[in-house]
């Protein structure tokens, strides 16, 4: 559970000075928000996770191991319900704030989202892209593509997909 991130620079995964680069889940996106297990409050981890979505949508969350599936199913099947739409919009806005901060700091050539964040992007792509564009310098001056992960497994797939893309595009080129 949680929000992960990865940065690929020149085809290599950047891990930072102590291996903890891009702990994006602990960016504050709501200073008065939910308490986080890190000791902070309003971290991306707890403000944009399936539990936050389900409770904001006024749904009773089931077992923790199925929260992601419950949230995704709810987005796909009941998005027109006012509580579901309001919850999705709140999470999209918080996710957009976090992504805008990353865009300002890193100026990435793209952002790839998996899990619930992919589902939120697919539910309302215009809203998420607008929040990132409105809140980031690079978003206003040029478009940073925000893309859904195309792989089905959610743990670090966005970063892995990006890191392996050159190999998938031209396998022989990596041998030279």
Spell out what each predicted region is.
Residues 32, 44-176:
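ATP-binding/phosphotransfer module of carbohydrate and carboxylate kinases, centering on a glycine-rich
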Residues 1-52, 159, 167-175:
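Phosphate-binding/catalytic loop of phosphoryl-transfer enzymes
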């Amino acid at each position: 559970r949680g929000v992960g991130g990865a940065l690929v620079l020149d085809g290599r995964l950047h891990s930072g000075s102590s291996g903890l680069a891009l702990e994006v889940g602990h960016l504050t996106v709501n200073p008065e928000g939910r308490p986080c297990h890190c000791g902070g409050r309003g971290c991306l981890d707890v403000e944009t996770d399936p539990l936050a979505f389900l409770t904001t949508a006024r749904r009773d969350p089931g077992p923790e191991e199925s929260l992601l599936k419950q949230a995704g199913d709810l987005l796909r099947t009941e998005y027109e319900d006012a509580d579901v739409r309001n919850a999705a919009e709140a999470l999209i806005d918080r996710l957009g704030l976090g992504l805008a901060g990353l865009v300002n700091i890193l100026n990435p050539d793209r952002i790839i989202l998996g899990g619930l964040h992919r589902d939120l992007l697919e539910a309302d792509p215009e809203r998420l892209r607008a929040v990132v564009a409105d809140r980031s310098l690079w978003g206003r001056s040029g478009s940073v593509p925000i893309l859904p992960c195309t792989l089905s497994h959610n743990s670090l797939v966005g970063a892995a997909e990006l890191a392996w893309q050159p190999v998938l595009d031209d396998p022989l080129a990596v041998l030279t």
